[in-house]
Curated annotation (Swiss-Prot):
Molecular chaperone. Has ATPase activity. It comes from the Bacteria. Residues 343-559 are annotated as: B. Belongs to the heat shock protein 90 family. The lineage of its organism: Bacteria, Pseudomonadati, Pseudomonadota, Gammaproteobacteria, Pseudomonadales. GO terms for cellular component: cytoplasm. The gene is htpG. InterPro entries: HATPase_C_sf (IPR036890), Heat_shock_protein_90_CS (IPR019805), HSP90_C (IPR037196), Hsp90_fam (IPR001404), Hsp90_N (IPR020575), Ribosomal_Su5_D2-typ_SF (IPR020568). This is Chaperone protein HtpG. Residues 560-634 are annotated as: C. Keywords: ATP-binding, Chaperone, Cytoplasm, Nucleotide-binding, Stress response. Residues 1-342 are annotated as: A. Homodimer. Disulfide bonds: none annotated.
């Protein structure tokens, strides 16, 4: 090794120290993953070189054959991994190997579960895979030179994973990165060709780059040649280019883990080659769990884009709509040019056609999963259901298809589990029912006990219970499904159509007429709180209820707007009374107008609480209630 110059010792960023401590002391149950992570990084380095060399072929320095070499030295107890990819400059080394993006680290540490096997796989997802080397090594040396820089600008990084690292400038004639792991005592098993070969086959067979090991000679062949002979130990072909019939499920699963930096198997995948007007291959995966940043709409997302097997970019987000941002995979196009950029992707009509086809492909895959593997679909819904609910607003063309994939809780069950498909609901509709009834609210316990459901329980009509914050917004984009319109049971004047008999309707009219005097008194007292007072057709057990005006915002939408700092339009609820309830009868008979007013306000506030709303003046409610209790106990 050449003379080192400009040598300096630097301290690790605090988060890196935490991470190293974790790697060394916690993630030792699945040690072999260090090799998977380092190979994955080397593969990325080769992808980056290929991409940059499209615009600047000199970067290849005459060596366009990219590969990864893994070797070992039993006597020195070392494992060496070398690639001829893009390499790193001194600045890159200090940045990438001494610090981690704070957001990534914080999220990494937050996501640790204490389960060693799961935690060991999290490291790739958060871009900290390099540090897994310290699981098996007590010292790591990195020698690197960035493609395009002179040989004199190589860099040597070295650390024992304790609190600091050394960095020095060296001569390095060949571009790329060489990592030497000085194995800890007790980790000698990895300085072995057979062991390394098995780990590579297990985790990295799908890597499209040849991964080479030195050929081993045994018995009569034991005379080793002066120069090692290298042999490729992985398939080294892009998995998506192979015919589906030739790819085993296990290979698809391992490739997913590489692409998604995930440790769990995917729930489903779809591998397709499209020929004709457009030519491209796609391999799309539905993950088995939600990533930590699923609800950050600005978080990186998208597919890996290749053009004619050449890697172009990670996170190409133009191929799928935002509501499918959880889908992972690759798309390899023959129609795009090799110098394609993000700006071009946004304008190219070819992309629109591909996006439309890939979106349909994903929705078909989800339909198939729901139909053939309902338990797996339950897992999918638990992880990604709320994101899929963004679909009807974003993708009008596929609204009906997306609606068929949605799942809801309903009054038909007791668990609150979101397992009811709209098609199932329609299949159970009562004779004469032509609408899909639903109720939105803050929580399952609140909506299942809502007074709004009383008449539906009495008539045995199923009601969907929607408690996700996005639900009211979703329903504003979903007016109907399969020809049946949706009706919010808490909104407007409830009309059950033919589910109410003519006798029912006649009786309702007569009762409303008999209570006209009471309605007028209530209107006067509640003029500032209620937009309207009327007799209710919804109630069988409760004295009163609040309904939402046909054009007014519901509670969920008001809360979303308030939380985002937007102005919420002023609106008053409709106050409905149950004329047969003893409290309403007593109220009607109350001659003292002051006491009538106090009791009316108590009933109004109780109805607001039952609807999940907060009181504008809780103190006044408590004062009135206490006064009433004193009167009753006198």
């Amino acid at each position: 090794m050449s003379v080192e110059t400009q040598k300096e010792t630097l301290g690790f960023q605090t988060e890196v120290k935490q991470l190293l401590h974790l790697m060394i002391h916690s993630l030792y149950s699945n040690k072999e993953i260090f090799l998977r992570e380092l190979i994955s990084n080397a593969s990325d380095a080769a992808d980056k070189l290929r991409f940059e060399a499209l615009a600047n072929p000199e970067l290849l320095e005459g060596g366009a054959e990219l590969k990864i070499r893994v070797s070992f030295d039993k006597e020195a107890n070392t494992v060496t991994l070398e690639d001829n990819g893009i390499g790193m400059s001194r600045e890159d080394v200090v940045t990438h190997l001494g610090t981690i993006a704070k957001s990534g680290t914080a999220d990494f540490l937050k996501n640790l579960s204490g389960d060693q096997k799961k935690d060991s796989h999290l490291i790739g997802q958060f871009g900290v895979g390099f540090y897994s080397a310290f699981i098996v090594a007590d010292k790591v040396d990195v020698y690197s030179r960035r493609a395009g820089q002179p040989a004199s600008e190589g860099v040597h990084w070295s650390s024992k994973g304790e609190g600091e690292f050394d960095v020095a400038t060296i001569d390095k004639p060949e571009r790329g990165t060489r990592i030497v792991l000085h194995l800890k005592k007790g980790e000698e098993e990895f300085a072995d060709g057979w062991r390394l070969r098995n780990v590579i086959k297990k985790y990295s067979d799908h890597i499209a780059l040849p991964i080479e090991l030195p050929k081993e000679f045994h018995g009569e062949e034991a005379e080793k040649p002066a120069e090692p002979e290298w042999e490729t130990v992985n398939r080294a072909s892009a998995l998506w280019t192979r015919p589906r019939a030739e790819v085993k499920d296990e290979e698809y699963q391992e490739f997913y883990k590489h692409v998604a930096h995930d440790f769990e198997n995917p729930l489903s995948w779809s591998h397709n080659k499209v020929e004709g007007k457009l030519e491209y291959t796609s391999l799309l995966y539905v993950p088995g769990r939600a990533p930590f940043d699923l609800y950050h709409r600005e978080a990186p997302r998208g597919l890996k884009l290749y053009v004619q097997r050449v890697f172009i970019m990670d996170q190409a987000d133009e191929f799928l709509p935002l509501y499918l941002r959880f889908i992972k995979g690759v798309v390899d196009s023959n129609d795009l040019s090799l110098n394609v950029s993000r700006e071009i992707l946004q304008k190219d009509p070819v992309i629109d056609s591909m996006k439309s086809a890939l979106t349909k492909r994903v929705l078909d895959m989800l339909e198939k999963l729901a139909k053939n593997e309902p338990e797996q679909y339950k897992t999918f819904w638990k992880n990604f259901g709320q994101v899929l609910k963004e679909g009807p607003a974003e993708d009008f063309g596929n609204k009906e298809k997306i609606a068929g994939l949605l799942r809801f809780a309903s009054t038909g069950g007791d668990s609150g589990e979101q397992s009811v498909a709209l098609a199932d609901y329609i299949g159970r509709m009562k004779e004469g029912q032509d609408k899909i009834y639903y109720l939105t609210g803050e929580s399952y316990s609140q909506v299942k006990n809502s007074p709004h459901l009383e008449v539906f329980r009495k008539k045995g009509i199923e009601v969907l219970l929607l408690t996700d914050r996005i639900d009211e917004w979703l329903m504003s984009y979903l007016p109907d499904f399969d020809g049946k319109s949706f009706v919010d049971v808490a909104r407007g004047d409830l009309d059950l159509g033919s589910l109410d008999s003519e006798e029912d309707k006649k009786a309702q009219e007569e009762v409303a007429k008999s209570k006209e005097g009471l309605i007028e008194r209530l209107k006067k007292v509640l003029d500032e709180q209620a937009s309207e007072v009327r007799v209710s057709h919804r109630l069988t057990d409760s004295p009163a209820i609040l309904a939402i005006g046909e054009q007014d915002l519901g509670l969920q939408m008001r809360q979303i707007l308030e939380a985002s700092g937007q102005k919420v339009p002023e609106s008053k609820p409709i106050f409905e009374i149950n004329p047969q309830h003893p409290l309403i009868e007593k109220l009607d008979a109350e001659p003292d107008e002051d006491r009538f007013g106090e009791l009316s306000h108590i009933l109004f506030d109780q109805a607001a609480l039952a609807a999940g709303d907060s009181l504008k003046d809780p103190g006044a409610y408590v004062r009135r209630l206490n006064k009433l209790l004193v009167e009753l106990s006198a």
